[in-house]
């Protein structure tokens, strides 16, 4: 893990509101704005950025050196965790639903841009059957992963936990209070 206290997540990430102009909106006298959370980072943006922010802060606080999370073969959460983990100096491990994908990893990475990008950012994969994937939160499964990869900070599937909620609360700011509907 990096020895510096600087963090990818430490900046002031207030996303802009971009107005959408369409004839139908003008005709109906409606103003429509889109919150541009997608502009934060090419791979770690929007709710993925917000969900990971405090989880990675907590992992650092606990002095963890690696992260483990779960997802499907096309999971944006898997990719965001790999990229954010690399930026923050963590090793990353992904439990991927679909054991057939692990039978020919070269072919899988050629055909699956999401897993390829996560792999290129250093994530190591463990492919499991859908049945075993349903047991991913069990004590026995987690212990097997600790035996395989050592101690890690566990991020739930999709990054969803109370720390993720704290991060997502930062999406709306006082500048957004002027809107009637969100």
PLM ranges: what are they?
Residues 1-182:
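PLP-dependent amino-acid enzyme catalytic core
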């Amino acid at each position: 893990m990096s020895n510096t206290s600087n963090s990818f997540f430490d900046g002031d990430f207030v996303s802009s509101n971009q107005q959408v102009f369409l004839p139908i909106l003008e005709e109906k006298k409606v103003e429509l704005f889109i919150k541009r959370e997608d502009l934060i980072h090419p791979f770690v943006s929007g709710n993925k950025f917000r969900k990971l922010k405090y989880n990675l802060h907590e992992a650092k606080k606990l002095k963890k050196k690696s992260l483990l999370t779960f997802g499907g073969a096309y999971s944006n959460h898997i990719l965001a965790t790999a990229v954010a983990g690399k930026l923050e100096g963590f090793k990353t491990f992904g439990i991927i639903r679909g054991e057939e994908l692990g039978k020919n990893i070269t072919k899988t990475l050629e055909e699956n841009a999401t897993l390829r990008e996560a792999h290129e950012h250093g994530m190591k994969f463990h492919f499991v059957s859908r049945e075993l994937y349903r047991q991913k939160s069990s004590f026995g499964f987690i212990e097997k992963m600790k035996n395989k990869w050592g101690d890690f900070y566990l991020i739930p599937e999709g990054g969803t936990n109370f720390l993720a909620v704290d991060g997502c609360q930062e999406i709306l700011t006082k500048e957004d209070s002027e809107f009637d509907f969100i």
